[in-house]
């Protein structure tokens, strides 16, 4: 019996490995997240290798080609169109973005902190609604994403309101008072690693950056989820919580945002 060609054996082996990965994703995440995981961890790296660039660079190039310079709304629409029609990306998106807009307009923060800039979508979205003199500090750990965020912010015409800081949130947060002249924060938008939501919330409080009335708005608390953060803010009398059910960006997968208004450390006391 003739032996199978090595290339064929390699292809079969790779197919089996990918099938196992898909089944594991399906078991732990369900179909919605499974498809996203398959795209992000399997198809996307292959696409990047073939194209010679990254998805984030392709999003920026699409904006530069199709959006109007200095028009923040045009930038958002270009990103949404690209991510709906061509490649999924982890922006807050248009559906949940409207909820973010409403919270910004309701509370009108003067000093806003964003944890996780990615490609700059939410930074542009929030900065365009800030009052004159208000500012947004956005922290991004990935230098490549930070560079794209800066270009996106510049192109959208909101760079005068946005300060981009490259680094890990747990390293930057303790520097905010002295290095970035922050007394307390009016609002914090959490959209970085979900396992950092709770530690960074505790760190913000420890560093004296939360005041009575500070608004925490956390994305993706259902999908992929931030259960420890939700348990903490909902179970603490220091926070007044509101949940906004919505859908995962550019997908019909249930997700939501959690708004937690800080009531002060003294609110914890009880019988």
From Swiss-Prot:
Modified-residue entries (Phosphoserine), positions: 267
Catalytic activity: a catechol + S-adenosyl-L-methionine = a guaiacol + S-adenosyl-L-homocysteine + H(+); 2-hydroxyestrone + S-adenosyl-L-methionine = 2-hydroxy-3-methoxy-estrone + S-adenosyl-L-homocysteine + H(+); 4-hydroxyestrone + S-adenosyl-L-methionine = 4-methoxyestrone + S-adenosyl-L-homocysteine + H(+); 2-hydroxyestrone + S-adenosyl-L-methionine = 2-methoxyestrone + S-adenosyl-L-homocysteine + H(+)
Superkingdom of the source species: Eukaryota
Cofactor binding, note field: Binds 1 Mg(2+) ion per subunit.
Result after altering residue 72 to S: Correlated with reduced enzyme activity; associated with increased risk for schizophrenia
Key words, A-Z: Catecholamine metabolism, Cell membrane, Cytoplasm, Lipid metabolism, Magnesium, Membrane, Metal-binding, Methyltransferase, Neurotransmitter degradation, Phosphoprotein, S-adenosyl-L-methionine, Schizophrenia, Signal-anchor, Transferase, Transmembrane, Transmembrane helix
Transmembrane domains' residue ranges: 7-26
Post-translational modification (record): The N-terminus is blocked.
SUPFAM superfamilies: S-adenosyl-L-methionine-dependent methyltransferases (SSF53335)
Molecular function GO labels: catechol O-methyltransferase activity; magnesium ion binding; methyltransferase activity; O-methyltransferase activity
Enzyme Commission (EC) number: 2.1.1.6
Binding-site list for Mg(2+): 191, 219-220
Cystine connections: none
Gene Ontology CC: one annotated term: plasma membrane
CDD domains tied to this protein: AdoMet_MTases
Binding site for S-adenosyl-L-methionine: 92, 114, 122, 140-141, 167-170, 191
Cofactor(s) recorded in Swiss-Prot or TrEMBL: Mg(2+)
Resulting phenotype, residue 158 to M: In allele COMT*2; associated with low enzyme activity and thermolability; may increase the tendency to develop high blood pressure and abdominal obesity
Cytoplasmic side: 1-6
Residue ranges, Extracellular side: 27-271
GO biological process, one term: exploration behavior
Family: Belongs to the class I-like SAM-binding methyltransferase superfamily. Cation-dependent O-methyltransferase family.
PANTHER family, per the entry: CATECHOL O-METHYLTRANSFERASE, CATECHOL O-METHYLTRANSFERASE 1-RELATED
Disease involvement: Schizophrenia: A complex, multifactorial psychotic disorder or group of disorders characterized by disturbances in the form and content of thought (e.g. delusions, hallucinations), in mood (e.g. inappropriate affect), in sense of self and relationship to the external world (e.g. loss of ego boundaries, withdrawal), and in behavior (e.g bizarre or apparently purposeless behavior). Although it affects emotions, it is distinguished from mood disorders in which such disturbances are primary.
Name assigned to this protein: Catechol O-methyltransferase
Lineage summary: Eukaryota, Metazoa, Chordata, Craniata, Vertebrata
């Amino acid at each position: 019996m003739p032996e199978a060609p090595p290339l064929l054996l390699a292809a079969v082996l790779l197919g089996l490995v990918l099938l196992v990965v898909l089944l594991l994703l399906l078991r732990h995440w369900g179909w919605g997240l499974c498809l996203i995981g398959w795209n992000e961890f399997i198809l996307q790296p292959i696409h990047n290798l073939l194209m010679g660039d990254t998805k984030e660079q392709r999003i920026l190039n699409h904006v530069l080609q199709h959006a109007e310079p200095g028009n923040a709304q045009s930038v958002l629409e270009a990103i949404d169109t690209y991510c709906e029609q061509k490649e999924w990306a982890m922006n807050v998106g248009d559906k949940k973005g409207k909820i973010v807009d409403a919270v910004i307009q309701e509370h009108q923060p003067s000093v806003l902190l964003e944890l996780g800039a990615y490609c700059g979508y939410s930074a542009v979205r929030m900065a365009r609604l800030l009052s004159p003199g208000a500012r947004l500090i956005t922290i991004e750990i990935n230098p490549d994403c930070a560079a794209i965020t800066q270009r996106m912010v510049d192109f959208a015409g909101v760079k005068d309101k946005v300060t981009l800081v490259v680094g890990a949130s747990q390293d930057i947060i303790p520097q905010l008072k002295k290095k970035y002249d922050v007394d307390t924060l009016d609002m914090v938008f959490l959209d970085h690693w979900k396992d950092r939501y709770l530690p960074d919330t505790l760190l913000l409080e420890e560093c004296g950056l939360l005041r009575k009335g500070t608004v925490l708005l956390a994305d993706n608390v259902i999908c992929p989820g931030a259960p420890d953060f939700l348990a903490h803010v909902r179970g603490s009398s220091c926070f007044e919580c509101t949940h906004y059910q919505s859908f995962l960006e550019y997908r019909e997968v249930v997700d939501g945002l959690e708004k937690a208004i800080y009531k002060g450390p003294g609110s914890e006391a009880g019988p």
